[in-house]
Amino acid sequence: SATGCGQMTFNQKLAGHWVSGSCESAGSGSYIKRDFTLTESTWKLNATVYNDAACTVKFLGLDIAGPYTVVQESTAVAGATEVNYQVTDRRLIPLSDGAVQLLMQGKCGAGPWAVNQIADIALTGCAPLGFPSNAQCPGGELDLNQIDGNNLFFGDRSADLCKARPTKLGAYPVTRAQ
């Protein structure tokens, strides 16, 4: 429901379907396309990681979901809002032999890994990819969001979001899908 004077809450503004406008650099020679679905209380991310800048060679799929809580307006970034994203579901889908080989290198899921086989990593995390287990990040990810027209920005991903909230926004927004 709306707040006084017909103003929408930040949760209401977040609710919707948001997608990458293009192939985004994810660092280390990998690229990503993100697809978020948010309600007024839950979030879901379906992401695909690619090996090429045109996003044609699939490497890995990632599905993450859970509830979220709007905390307050950011004191570090003007116009942004602090949001905590809890993770209840975290699944990986290796989409290439290279992804299978990477996932077999360290503690990542219960294994064994196979191309196109979904594996839940919520309990184990995935050290080779830098994903904590749910127990290692009990408060969820401490993030920032800013809505600018039809663009939704998240916080910069360079820090450990289990321990510290970003102090700047990421370079790539997702766009509200119609």
Tell me the role of every PLM-derived stretch.
Residues 20-29, 44-178:
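Contiguous, well-ordered beta-strand patches that form the walls/edges
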Residues 36-45:
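Conserved beta-hairpin
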Residues 4-21, 31, 35-37:
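N-terminal helix-cap/turn-to-beta initiation motif at the start of protein domains
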